Amino acid sequence: MYTILLVGIGGFIGATLRYVFGGWIQNSFVNFPVGTLTINTIGSFFLGLIMYFSEYQGLFSDQTRIFLTIGILGAFTTLSTFGYESFRLLDDSKLMLMSINVVSTVLFSMMAVYLGKTVALGVSSYLLGGMK
């Protein structure tokens, strides 16, 4: 029950952050879903960072990891909005923009996870004497 509460609290935090930052970022862009792309990229970076710290250093307890990854980042990032916005671009006959959105979201998210892992490895090596 405690873990479910942690996920719920994390979800509240993540969803609120997504609403505030996603809207703020998107306000400058009308024709392309930059807000969702940015949110998903940032979330992917932090997921890579947290998971590698958690998996290789045991830096986070299981409950902390669940709170951060499933709760906060799960609500912060948004696959459903990405799908909806991509379909809207396609529905509006903006095939090129839709393609750019799909490819850039997948590539940026994967690169961000890799960057998060790289930062975790670097910080770990510098502060903690390297990964196990």
UniProtKB/Swiss-Prot annotation:
The chain crosses the membrane at residues 4-24, 32-52, 66-86, 95-115. It comes from Methanosarcina barkeri (strain Fusaro / DSM 804). This is Fluoride-specific ion channel FluC 3. InterPro entries: FluC (IPR003691). Na(+) binds at residues 74, 77. The lineage of its organism: Archaea, Methanobacteriati, Methanobacteriota, Stenosarchaea group, Methanomicrobia. One of its GO terms (molecular function) is metal ion binding. The keyword Metal-binding applies. NCBIfam families: crcB. Keywords: Cell membrane, Ion channel, Ion transport, Membrane, Metal-binding, Sodium, Transmembrane, Transmembrane helix, Transport. Its main location: membrane. GO terms for biological process: cellular detoxification of fluoride. It catalyses: fluoride(in) = fluoride(out). GO terms for cellular component: plasma membrane. Na(+) is not transported, but it plays an essential structural role and its presence is essential for fluoride channel function. It is a multi-pass membrane protein. Disulfide bonds: none annotated. The gene is fluC3. Belongs to the fluoride channel Fluc/FEX (TC 1.A.43) family. It is found in: Cell membrane. Fluoride-specific ion channel. Important for reducing fluoride concentration in the cell, thus reducing its toxicity.
